[in-house]
Amino acid sequence: MTSSTESKHSNDESTDLEKQDAEESHGLPEERKQDIAAQLSSSDVQDPNLVDWDGPDDPANPMNWPKSKRLGHVVMASLTTLFANITSTAFAPAASSLEAEFGITSSITAALTVSIYLLGFAFGPLVIAPLSEHFGRLPVYRVCTVITVAFLIGCAQAKNLGMFLVFRLITGIAGSGPGTIGGGTIADVMAPENRGKAMGAFAMGPLMGPVLGPLMSGFIAQYLDWRWVFRVLCIATGVMTIVLYFVMTETYGPVLLKRKAARLRKETGNPDLHTKLEASGVSPLASLWMALQRPTKMLIFSPITLLLSLYCAFVFGLLILLFTTFSAVYRQQYGFNVSMGGLSYLGLGFGLAIGLVLFGMLSDKVAKKDSARSSEWKPEARLLLMVWFAPVIPGGFFWYGWTAYYKVHWILPMMGTSLIGMGALMVMMPIQVYLVDAFGPRVAASALAANTLLRSLAGCFLPLAGPSLYEALGLGWGNTLLGFIAIGFTCLPILFYRFGGKLRLRFPVTF
């Protein structure tokens, strides 16, 4: 009963897609046809029971959906990721009122109330990404957003510190879902040469979310209390969850093909019909176990994944360190109150916004131009922007540290953090797009999960060192130390730009 209903729905949907696509474009661009053809098996006449896409123009393939539908999924993936990342730091301006209510005196414990969310961001992807590659993207989006809403309510109603920390950790685990599989969703619906702008929109979540959070919650914390921060987040995330349920559909190709094979087996009565994945002879349980291991294995056996994820983690950890110390720095150095403290994030936010615009304008153009010299698409071309902008980060730290130390007008430290924000985006975004392009839709979510694991661990634990670092070395030398470490990382994009192709061949992801 269910299968026949699904069959009828699928046939109707395919007919609609064919009509819309024909009206929209009268044929696919040749570049997209070539990319889709790469997903198809070579006409395997030796296996007439193999179920695959019906050629490169198959309207059921998410790559061939109408542009509006594909962009709709990019927007939803980006917005759900943005909301999850707003939640990561929105609580920061209100942390002092929670500390007073629960009698927190340790600076490390105080920082943990904000950063423990990112501990959930670290470990959630290790399970969430493999589940999306086994069961599909859509169930993961739905389950994660519902759990997030439920535990945001828990945070708002917490009666003691232990309860709050547990609820916030679980919120972080569930909140990591959209960011973990969003890159996979984009890989499902966008051709490699057109992913730059889509990934730029997606980057608003991990990079702009932590900036927008304190800006939005600063006045709530000033005039209400910390519990209302979580209530507002719960309402906003709940609305987004309802929209997601009505707008998003499944995009993961292997899952769609498995459904197609099941439908055809029922319609034709041929039990031998199968997909390439089903033909591998691997049981569903074994396939799930392999998928669960994949992110960890990529960190161990792929130097590309490990080293670039370490760089991304360091940069992200620096951003969260700044987020958790801005309020104290601007209060002590410039006398900002709680509501004004949210304004201290503007410089970093402005820099991230500038970086986002630059990345959207330049990424695809630079990558296509660089690849054209070798007459083939080269994922390493994505790293060229990173080579150019990586030195901006240490420069920003030197500027911010010493202007804040000498209490120069508050606009100047913000200008320094603008440089940090722009440089951070132009480092982190090329890494994420490169991982998607280098490993392809099949394991893109696992590659990003491995990246998210290290990034979130750094985001959780590096900020804990911030107060002690500034207390021991001061704002000037403390930020100078961070800048010098950042200089050491600038050689990585150059090395991977030149030798990344050879490393991909030397260490292929076959697991």
Curated annotation (Swiss-Prot):
> Its membrane topology, per UniProt?
Multi-pass membrane protein
| Sequence similarity | Belongs to the major facilitator superfamily.
GO MF terms held by the record: transmembrane transporter activity
**Major subcellular site:** membrane
For the keyword Glycoprotein, the answer is yes
One Gene Ontology cellular component annotation held by this UniProt entry: membrane
Source organism of this protein record: Macrophomina phaseolina (strain MS6)
**CDD domains for the chain:** MFS_Tpo1_MDR_like
Q: Where in the cell is it found?
A: Membrane
Compositional bias ranges of the Basic and acidic residues kind: 1-35
| Residues that carry a glycan | N337
Q: Which Gene3D superfamilies match?
A: MFS general substrate transporter like domains
Its name, as the record gives it, is MFS-type transporper mpsC
